[in-house]
Swiss-Prot record:
It catalyses: 2-C-methyl-D-erythritol 4-phosphate + CTP + H(+) = 4-CDP-2-C-methyl-D-erythritol + diphosphate. The record marks 20, 27 as: Transition state stabilizer. Catalyzes the formation of 4-diphosphocytidyl-2-C-methyl-D-erythritol from CTP and 2-C-methyl-D-erythritol 4-phosphate (MEP). PROSITE patterns: ISPD. The lineage of its organism: Bacteria, Pseudomonadati, Pseudomonadota, Gammaproteobacteria, Pasteurellales. GO terms for biological process: isopentenyl diphosphate biosynthetic process, methylerythritol 4-phosphate pathway. NCBIfam families: ispD. This is 2-C-methyl-D-erythritol 4-phosphate cytidylyltransferase. SUPFAM superfamilies: Nucleotide-diphospho-sugar transferases. Keywords: Isoprene biosynthesis, Nucleotidyltransferase, Transferase. PANTHER family: 2-C-METHYL-D-ERYTHRITOL 4-PHOSPHATE CYTIDYLYLTRANSFERASE, CHLOROPLASTIC. Its EC number is 2.7.7.60. GO terms for molecular function: 2-C-methyl-D-erythritol 4-phosphate cytidylyltransferase activity. Pathway: Isoprenoid biosynthesis; isopentenyl diphosphate biosynthesis via DXP pathway; isopentenyl diphosphate from 1-deoxy-D-xylulose 5-phosphate: step 2/6.
Amino acid sequence: MTRHSRPIIAVVPAAGVGSRMQADKPKQYLTLLGKTLLEHTLEVLLSYTPIQQIILAVAENDPYLDQLDVIRQPKIKIVQGGRDRAGSVFNGLKAITQPHAWVMVHDAARPCLTHEDLDKLLQIEDDNGGILAIPAVDTIKRASAEKQIIQTEDRSQLWQAQTPQFFRADLLYRALQQAFEHGLAVTDEASAMEFAGFRPHLVAGRSDNLKVTRPEDLKLAEFYLSRK
């Protein structure tokens, strides 16, 4: 199957609470420029023609979801999220019915994604898959439990992982299964694929594809979105 004929599915884990935001609701439902973060994110994916379906994994009895008109788009399928991000992604993968599908896993709170970056990911064809990432630009320190510097890392080989992360759906499903069986802490999909023996490609992304994690990130995301 060529890259032009393979089904492309997006999985968006959106069941988290975002405790570091110190907000009165999960961060994906915070509002920027009249829309929630989740709406901004979904609209980018919906408007990208190669994506055939978006699987949205949300918390059970989510009280905010039905307030969003965008979730009624026919491309969007809702599934129940898991206990953590990896569990939500796993549930999303289980809902994929298309054979030979490739999956783009994207954070609900990364609203500034561009189609140009998605185009670059779609160039990947081998089973290693790949992720958007940016080279580390700040000096990186390794710390002790007491928050004292142990050493300075060589940043020339360090990259900061972003999303989407793009893999064959069946391979990612098996990689997550294997990671769960071994009790691996899966912080992103690439870590599960690495554990399974793959070497995902690093695709240079953009610094404005930020994940809204802390209160100060909201203003920065608003600035980037206002310039689109």
